[in-house]
Amino acid sequence: MLAQSCCLRLLILLLLFKSTCSVREKSQKYFKNRKLRERRIKLYGTKKTEIQPLLISTWNYTDANLQAWSVLQQGPRRTRMAVMQGCMACQNQRCGRLLAGGSSPDSEGTLTLEAAIMDGEHLEYGAVAAMEGARNAILVADAVLRYTKHSVLVGKSATKFARSLGYKEEFLTDGRTKSVWKKWRSNGCQPNFWRDVRPPPTENCGPYTPLPEHLHQHPMHQEYAITQGQHDQLAFLALDAEGKFHVASQSSGAQFRIPGRVGDAAVPGAGIYADNDVGGAVASGDGDVLMRHLPAFLAVEAMRAGKRPDQAAKWVVQRLLRHNTEFNGAVVVVNRRGIYAAACAGLDEFHFVVSGGKGYLIMARVERIKCLERESEVVDDGPKGLFPTIPEKQAVPRG
């Protein structure tokens, strides 16, 4: 009887000890997980982290930016309409030599447009290129995204598609277009985009025939010149309070391009790209170079791999310069928390316009970057000037 009592007491003590150890292990595991969770929140935030709506557009057209911003302010899930409004505003305001300005015809004197829009939530993309007869090309690009299973439509077929959906056909070429084109023809069609043909394209208008391959000179590629107020592509990026991105671009194409040419504004990842899980990017510059390297896509993927927006922007521009030493252009990068950065090269100065962001009262503020040929300044979400590199965990929008 005594032996049974001792065994029972021993069993009870063992059970109590095991229970105590189990509680201790669970407690330690809880606090360990709590510390890990707190660390993750500190570094990366949570789904409930407050995001301030943000509207960014390339170059310094503040009115178009404000019109897009007014749409974004109406509430969540207005990013699509906001970027479209920005593109249409620039169409109507004749931003630069863009769109309705009529001063960017192809080598036959015809004005064509291209545009694209991308949804960062579903990674859906719609674009048109080399399209005649439709003034608001961004509306047609949006229709490609929403009503078809395709991504890009081009040329007269894109115009036919627009007409089938009820968009009014308009003759875009005007007196200014003809005047600019005639002046270019009288100057021997200089500059143009031909090479390794005869007669020499540096002196003649053509028609051209190919040179035998052994006569190809492969001269150093001269980049397409981009100067303030003389660019032909604009891009808009919108981020709402729910962390949803839309990006869009619209262009009238490189001046005096060969007919049929598709530009960066219509190519996924060249002029625009967005992924809600990571962020978004817009690029501007020599479109043929941008199409070869897809800088907007590269910038987003660089952030996915762990780079901060300022690091991603600078890395992309430096990569472009390694292969195209005369490249002129810029990239603006935004992560999923609304932290933005930009880098440029080959220009005297690059401008982009920002509305929104945490702590900012001034809307449509113009950010300016002084650019170098091989090294770029980096703007890191702040006032104008030179900006230091700051650790990611401290890179919160400053008020």
From Swiss-Prot:
The keyword Signal applies. One of its GO terms (molecular function) is N4-(beta-N-acetylglucosaminyl)-L-asparaginase activity. Keywords: Disulfide bond, Signal. It comes from the Eukaryota. SUPFAM superfamilies: N-terminal nucleophile aminohydrolases (Ntn hydrolases) (SSF56235). This is L-asparaginase-like protein GE13669. Belongs to the Ntn-hydrolase family. Residues 1-22 form the signal peptide. InterPro entries: Ntn_hydrolases_N (IPR029055), Peptidase_T2 (IPR000246). It comes from Drosophila yakuba. PANTHER family: L-ASPARAGINASE, N(4)-(BETA-N-ACETYLGLUCOSAMINYL)-L-ASPARAGINASE. One of its GO terms (cellular component) is lysosome. Disulfide bonds join C90-C95, C189-C205, C344-C371.
